UniProtKB/Swiss-Prot annotation:
A single MF term (Gene Ontology): zinc ion binding
GO biological process annotation, one example: RNA modification
Ranges for the PPR repeats: 43-77, 78-112, 114-139, 140-174, 175-209, 210-240, 241-275, 276-310, 311-341, 342-372, 378-413, 414-444
Protein name: Pentatricopeptide repeat-containing protein At2g41080
Pfam families according to UniProt: DYW_deaminase, E_motif, PPR, PPR_2
Record organism: Arabidopsis thaliana
UniProt keyword annotations, A-Z: Repeat
Region feature (Type DYW motif): 556-650
Organism placement in taxonomy: Eukaryota, Viridiplantae, Streptophyta, Embryophyta, Tracheophyta
Amino acid sequence: MRCSVSSVVRPLSVDPATAIATLCSKGNLREAFQRFRLNIFTNTSLFTPFIQSCTTRQSLPSGKQLHCLLVVSGFSSDKFICNHLMSMYSKLGDFPSAVAVYGRMRKKNYMSSNILINGYVRAGDLVNARKVFDEMPDRKLTTWNAMIAGLIQFEFNEEGLSLFREMHGLGFSPDEYTLGSVFSGSAGLRSVSIGQQIHGYTIKYGLELDLVVNSSLAHMYMRNGKLQDGEIVIRSMPVRNLVAWNTLIMGNAQNGCPETVLYLYKMMKISGCRPNKITFVTVLSSCSDLAIRGQGQQIHAEAIKIGASSVVAVVSSLISMYSKCGCLGDAAKAFSEREDEDEVMWSSMISAYGFHGQGDEAIELFNTMAEQTNMEINEVAFLNLLYACSHSGLKDKGLELFDMMVEKYGFKPGLKHYTCVVDLLGRAGCLDQAEAIIRSMPIKTDIVIWKTLLSACNIHKNAEMAQRVFKEILQIDPNDSACYVLLANVHASAKRWRDVSEVRKSMRDKNVKKEAGISWFEHKGEVHQFKMGDRSQSKSKEIYSYLKELTLEMKLKGYKPDTASVLHDMDEEEKESDLVQHSEKLAVAFALMILPEGAPIRIIKNLRVCSDCHVAFKYISVIKNREITLRDGSRFHHFINGKCSCGDYW
């Protein structure tokens, strides 16, 4: 049987642009380009898939070659093609070329301006972004969103909210992206009232169930200290996605609830939501705050498993976490295994060395950063260096670095830099010079810098200056309990009990409560916490009995309790009994009781360790042949064989 020509089924003709786009999306670029060559002069839309492919593959050279081909083909002035080119150049980091394309366009539309505004915002050039915005004859909602988001991203919150009000006044209805930005703006301004006003728009425009809007709304409440209100918003969401979980976790971190952060992280994983780099940065920070190394290591392993451990922000958080848990070696290992270079990462490692009193290592790392890398040295690096010098007794080197920061690098010292210099001089006993710097510096003082000097007065027993500094502090904050305690310590050291009584009476009259000293350590995933005179532990009787025997052993080795640090006028026996009850001693005693023989001990204390406990830990490290790491309110102390890493310079 013969078939007629008309009965043969012909293949359907496929539009070249569609065929090329399909091939590009599948990665078949060679076949796509062959199709492209056959139809190169027929349709401008044929170029679009290739431009998008260059953007996706991060191939700027190929994109530029394609741009040249467009010029030769006579399509380089087509506004749609130009928009794609601008987008490509902007996303691939060649923004000047995007601006050049925009400048040569004969006809522009709102998309052209939107791309340019977004590019300027990405480059941090808000002046030119606003110029393009103001010159636009016709603005769409996306244009307003881009400009508002840009202003708020760079913390021009008032300007961003003002632009939102202008937009709304012109009759534009906000969408989820608009409201997400303005909630961030009100969070940045720490204005609950503005945020609550904007909250009304979510209901008015039917966006009360939108995930983006609710996450931003919750962030606004939490950033303003309204943690419960933020949690209510998150719980009302029909679905809790990654952004919502991160908002909840970050909100608790910002409000000083690290234990809740770790609980929420656990619940997030149980829900099946996979963490990202933002999650890891936040939960590692909470591990740092609590100094719980075991959980930090577990989270590190989870970050490795999903490929987030090499992300710069995560590496910096790992360095900080291990450092604050007393594991400087692990922090250095995380730093050495980095895959990318970043100023924040280097500054984190310099800070870690400083926190552990290893000033020489911090300076060496800074010199390597300055001489062997292309990274910019910033004020933060110098701040960490000055801190390292102040905690290592490197007075002259610290002052030299301060001068270098100003004269060689041209940085204007901030209040924190001056505070480090005051600490540097104060610890070295140069109290008059430290006070002179505070009184002559060109910026306004705060309570921290005066407390730093008061602490130095305590170290060097300068009661006259301490009284003078205390008066300055009272003008700033008359309710800071630490300052009263420091002044009382100075008087107690000089056995000026009447002055001590006056300080204590002043605290009672003003209802100033002394912050309780708390010490803790982690063992097998459990945190054991102690406070001064704590008898709430199930083994309190055994702990005090163990401490009594340990104190006798220490005395046989030459230990003499530093009763001068007791702020009460009582007999020596009572003072010694008082010293035994310090939280860090209770913690180290229980750690010695339950940890395996020879295992290192890591203890955290929320306040500065007292001089007696510092001496006692030296003796304990010898008697029990243990390495003891103590993190107090200002630094780390590593006790090995009767010596402390701080060199008694603390």
